[in-house]
Amino acid sequence: MFSFVDSRLLLLIAATVLLTRGEGEEDIQTGSCVQDGLTYNDKDVWKPEPCQICVCDSGNILCDEVICEDTSDCPNAEIPFGECCPICPDVDASPVYPESAGVEGPKGDTGPRGDRGLPGPPGRDGIPGQPGLPGPPGPPGPPGLGGNFAPQMSYGYDEKSAGVAVPGPMGPAGPRGLPGPPGAPGPQGFQGPPGEPGEPGASGPMGPRGPAGPPGKNGDDGEAGKPGRPGQRGPPGPQGARGLPGTAGLPGMKGHRGFSGLDGAKGQPGPAGPKGEPGSPGENGAPGQMGPRGLPGERGRPGPSGPAGARGNDGAPGAAGPPGPTGPAGPPGFPGAAGAKGETGPQGARGSEGPQGSRGEPGPPGPAGAAGPAGNPGADGQPGAKGATGAPGIAGAPGFPGARGPSGPQGPSGAPGPKGNSGEPGAPGNKGDTGAKGEPGPAGVQGPPGPAGEEGKRGARGEPGPAGLPGPAGERGAPGSRGFPGADGIAGPKGPPGERGSPGAVGPKGSPGEAGRPGEAGLPGAKGLTGSPGSPGPDGKTGPPGPAGQDGRPGPAGPPGARGQAGVMGFPGPKGAAGEPGKPGERGAPGPPGAVGAAGKDGEAGAQGPPGPTGPAGERGEQGPAGAPGFQGLPGPAGPPGEAGKPGEQGVPGNAGAPGPAGARGERGFPGERGVQGPPGPQGPRGANGAPGNDGAKGDAGAPGAPGNEGPPGLEGMPGERGAAGLPGAKGDRGDPGPKGADGAPGKDGLRGLTGPIGPPGPAGAPGDKGEAGPPGPAGPTGARGAPGDRGEPGPPGPAGFAGPPGADGQPGAKGETGDAGAKGDAGPPGPAGPTGAPGPAGZVGAPGPKGARGSAGPPGATGFPGAAGRVGPPGPSGNIGLPGPPGPAGKZGSKGPRGETGPAGRPGEPGPAGPPGPPGEKGSPGADGPIGAPGTPGPQGIAGQRGVVGLPGQRGERGFPGLPGPSGEPGKQGPSGASGERGPPGPMGPPGLAGPPGEAGREGAPGAEGAPGRDGAAGPKGDRGETGPAGPPGAPGAPGAPGPVGPAGKNGDRGETGPAGPAGPPGPAGARGPAGPQGPRGDKGETGEQGDRGMKGHRGFSGLQGPPGPPGAPGEQGPSGASGPAGPRGPPGSAGAAGKDGLNGLPGPIGPPGPRGRTGEVGPVGPPGPPGPPGPPGPPSGGFDLSFLPQPPQEKAHDGGRYYRADDANVMRDRDLEVDTTLKSLSQQIENIRSPEGTRKNPARTCRDLKMCHGDWKSGEYWIDPNQGCNLDAIKVYCNMETGETCVYPTQATIAQKNWYLSKNPKEKKHVWFGETMSDGFQFEYGGEGSNPADVAIQLTFLRLMSTEATQNVTYHCKNSVAYMDHDTGNLKKALLLQGANEIEIRAEGNSRFTYGVTEDGCTSHTGAWGKTVIEYKTTKTSRLPIIDLAPMDVGAPDQEFGIDIGPVCFL
């Protein structure tokens, strides 16, 4: 049963499902189908083509191939027009029975000649003729272009010649040649299709009559006839067996208030309590007397260095330092704007031979050649005029049978044929009409009892039958089902008080009581002895930085620093405008710190600067060495109270102090957690009888007996609910004094004393904890990428995708099996009634038939596929009907047919003599109620019923008297005393700790207010049976209850003893039996008549009203537990639970307010490339999401007693509403994250372009992306250029050291050498930053390429005596590097422009002995080519040739 809250969830899900509904549904009539623009109704069958057959099944088109029968044994099979399967033209469609074939008729005349067939298809083309001779040469073309254009055309020119000859344009076409001679005639065409068939011949004479057919199938059994009228009423049966025990008595009255229970046994001493927590530090003690002045201490060790002062003013400029060494080459810059076009260079040397040019245009036709040999025959010409008729040729071979012609006109009827032989037996005919009823036959011999038939359909209600003989007494019926509980009776008078029961056994030990309230604070204890000095406290927090000192003198210039390593290549910035001439270069990176100079003189103190903002806390530094102790300073002014320190570890227990006076009683503590269930108590005395078992199935009711005497009153009802707890008993004796308690917490601090004189120097303290970190230093360089974290727990299952598009139609299924035979037809109308037959002898009793109602017909099966089309028989003309043949010989006697349909019921016969009583049959299903019979005479008084079941529990008793006070418990063991806490200011109130085990019992409290009733307790173990109490007075009869549902059958009870016979009822008058009139209105109740004769047994009456409860029966066996009662009223709210486990990390909070403005940054790298081009084609559709991760509402179990409805309990609803609201909030947050990703590891974006679109104001930087979506564990960290939307992936190792990587055995032989493939220490370049998984990056790059339209990458080649691109000596690009793309394509410096890279700086053109660099840039729309994975220089191999590589990030847009 859904609640409305669940339906809200469903609505949410349904709303999202609706999004996925297709929109292509057409409004076609329900169940019809459309194919090729034609509409078919449901169950229509059609053939879209000859060999396919289709059926429309409730809107679905099912098609199947027509399966043809094998015609391999038919030499001249034909396929009729519009059909699929071949048929034998000379096979008659009707079957021939070999034993009586008819005589063959004479052959018909040959039909007239058919029309001439259509011309055959044209023959294949002949082989083409030889080409014609070339035409004459054309006139010369105009002059070619000037020499300046030569380099553009230089596919190949001679190195020795200075210029180049360029062919002119093509001349005009020559004149058309003469037509060629005619070709030879073509080969003979294929044979045309056969002509139409001739008319059919006249039909042959009719064959002889076939022999008689086999006997037809036996007809189906007829339906059962209507039942006869009911017989007359039989005489009354003997008295029925003793009735079942009456239903349970009404609930007893409310019991008297119970006596107070005996005092409980004295409890065991409680376990020792846990060691107490150290007390909170006391307040300062009263000031001590001033001590004598101490000796001056030794000079302390230097203190730790103070925090950095504020930045001083700039010093005067120092003297210029010596120039540092040349720094390493910076990362490659981004491509500059194209320079102005240079002047034409000197003509280069002749290049190597270029590739073969594309095929030229065809030349002008040559002169006509000599005539070629005769060509193959040409295509057939038009048919010539018809020639004269030739002489008849030899008869040709018979042609293939032509296509079947249309049926000829029907020929004249033939003469009647001779009389045929007897035909085959015909198929069984349809059932004839019912014949007239025959005369009744003589009674047959009594047959043996037939087998049990199936149970017929239930007949219509019969008329009353004649009275039967009295039947034998039935077996005692099973107990009837228990009725519904009656309405509450009027409360009976109060019973006499029961005897006081013997005291019960001691119950199990109770669960520990709630902890007592904490006692009030005790009086302050006597002042303790002065404690030994505490260990030194932790260092205080660093104070605010002091005022800035005056500027120091400029220090001497440091020595030049060592050369730093080259930095990682930066991302491409946007292209900047051309700048003005640059300022002098920036100062070099600072060198390592020089030796410490001599300290300058202190400047005078400046004015106090304002305190700087607190820097973020740095990570904790390592423990420094302890400093020398400083001089003892004067005490400073009291600082603000520090934050509470972490609790110290537990100290060693102190000596036991003198016991303090008992404190006043504290406030009540939090209730402890529920204790462990105690061991079960000893078995109690046997309890009272359990509730009666479920009633057995209801037996057939006996004839009603006369009402019995009123039974003795029912048992007193079960005791009422437990009364409220009695008032607390009197206070118990005071317990023995406990052992000495732990020392009290130190008293509150006294007022502060006067400052004493400085004491003697103390021993050096233990080194204090390191102080808090100073303000943060300048940001360090970016660290190396960390190792990948452990794989997180798998995320929740991803949302299921939207429903996919419907699949294509499946292959047509195989041909369906033949459908089931249809349901049997209805029985025909009954014939007229025959005369009454003589009564037959009584049959033997048949064996009882198996029970079972006749099943109804099943629903019709689904539409089968259409069967294959049958062969088309050629229609013959129908002959005249032959004379009837002589009757065939009589067939063999058929086997006995199945039983015919039951004839119509005859008039009721005279009653036959009574047969012997049959064995009792199985209990039939109950028939419909007959008309109510006349009331029977009252039977003899029934035996008194068994004593009724114990009544329901009475009302709750009144509150009991207070119990006696229990004896005082033994004092618990002394707990260990807590360690003395360090003295400090009181900490903030901590959260309540977990409840400790129960302490010893407190003194008796004042009586509390009466609590609300608690929840029902769990059922206790079954007690022993109690003694029977005295009978109470009878209760007033209750109103009859509604009948209850039939329970499962209980065990039969033991038969009760026979009760005393009751007095006979007053006699009634005997009424004459009148005909049954229509039911009149209910009359007033008549007076009791005189005793009549004993009447015949009446029909079964309707169930009477519930009688008054009978006397109590003997106790039944323990019944099963009853169904759970309805839930009680909601109890008071429970105590606060223990603190839950820490929740999961919350979702990231909203972005905080912008921080303060940072310092001006250093000059940034060169800007990114220019604005993006026009938008690319739309990307692939994004994956949908679904809501399968919604939490399913928990399935509520129904109580045994009936369904539990959600709205029955408002608190449940509130909780579930809260749960739904929380789910919806979480869901909307998740959907928001899907729609607007944040680029974090937990919520990665798909590409930087997505981030730019969702968060256009975010800054460029590193973000996480997950192009393949799904689980975010394989997300990768990239740089997002937020101005362009580019996604840039760094290489794993961006810098390849500058050194000699390759020594060639033959340095003069120059060839390209791949760095990763061939060089011994080389490697192919990988991407994704340090610590990333290469497999994850490879997959993500594949998706990134698919979603991008353009990719760019720069590579810087650092060279020493190695040419990278242009060779200065030769002026060509032969020694230029090769690059290998991600799809293993080679990218070159020259050649096809799609596979060539460019350079933005070329400093590696010659061997100068100095380091230079060339910056290569490759930009492509074929994103699969990037990133670059290998590089091959050519100009390497000599010992003085060195190189290094900086690999830039690959950026996708």
From Swiss-Prot:
Post-translational modification remark: Contains mostly 4-hydroxyproline. Proline residues at the third position of the tripeptide repeating unit (G-X-Y) are 4-hydroxylated in some or all of the chains. Contains 3-hydroxyproline. This modification occurs on the first proline residue in the sequence motif Gly-Pro-Hyp, where Hyp is 4-hydroxyproline.
Disulfide bond entries: 1248-1280, 1288-1451, 1359-1404
Location of this chain's protein in the cell: Secreted, Extracellular space, Extracellular matrix
InterPro entries noted in UniProt: Collagen, Collagen_superfamily, Fib_collagen_C, VWF_dom
Region (Disordered): 98-1203
Propeptide residue interval(s): 23-151, 1208-1453
Compositionally biased spans, kind Low complexity: 162-176, 187-206, 265-284, 307-319, 350-361, 368-418, 463-482, 527-581, 623-664, 685-722, 800-827, 835-883, 890-908, 997-1021, 1070-1081, 1115-1139
Domain VWFC, first and last residues per copy: 31-89
Marked site positions, Not glycosylated: 1022, 1085
A Pfam family that the UniProt record links to this protein: VWC
A GO term from the CC aspect: collagen type I trimer
4-hydroxyproline PTM sites in chain numbering: 179, 182, 185, 194, 197, 200, 215, 230, 236, 245, 251, 269, 278, 281, 287, 296, 302, 317, 323, 332, 335, 362, 365, 377, 383, 392, 398, 401, 416, 425, 428, 440, 449, 464, 470, 479, 485, 497, 503, 512, 518, 524, 533, 536, 545, 554, 560, 572, 581, 584, 590, 593, 611, 629, 635, 641, 647, 653, 659, 671, 680, 692, 704, 707, 713, 719, 728, 737, 746, 761, 767, 776, 788, 794, 797, 806, 812, 830, 839, 848, 860, 866, 875, 884, 887, 908, 911, 917, 920, 926, 935, 953, 962, 965, 971, 986, 992, 998, 1007, 1013, 1034, 1037, 1040, 1067, 1109, 1112, 1115, 1133, 1148, 1154, 1169, 1172, 1175, 1178, 1181
Entry's Gene Ontology molecular function annotations: extracellular matrix structural constituent conferring tensile strength; metal ion binding
Signal sequence, renumbered to the chain: 1-22
Broad class of the protein's primary localization: secreted
5-hydroxylysine PTM sites in chain numbering: 254, 419, 494, 740, 851, 1022, 1085, 1097
Residues with the 3-hydroxyproline modification: 874, 1153, 1168, 1171, 1174
Residues in Fibrillar collagen NC1 domain copies: 1218-1453
SUPFAM superfamilies with a match to the protein in the record: FnI-like domain
Domain notes: The C-terminal propeptide, also known as COLFI domain, have crucial roles in tissue growth and repair by controlling both the intracellular assembly of procollagen molecules and the extracellular assembly of collagen fibrils. It binds a calcium ion which is essential for its function.
Family: Belongs to the fibrillar collagen family.
Protein name per the record: Collagen alpha-1(I) chain
Native source species: Gallus gallus (Chicken)
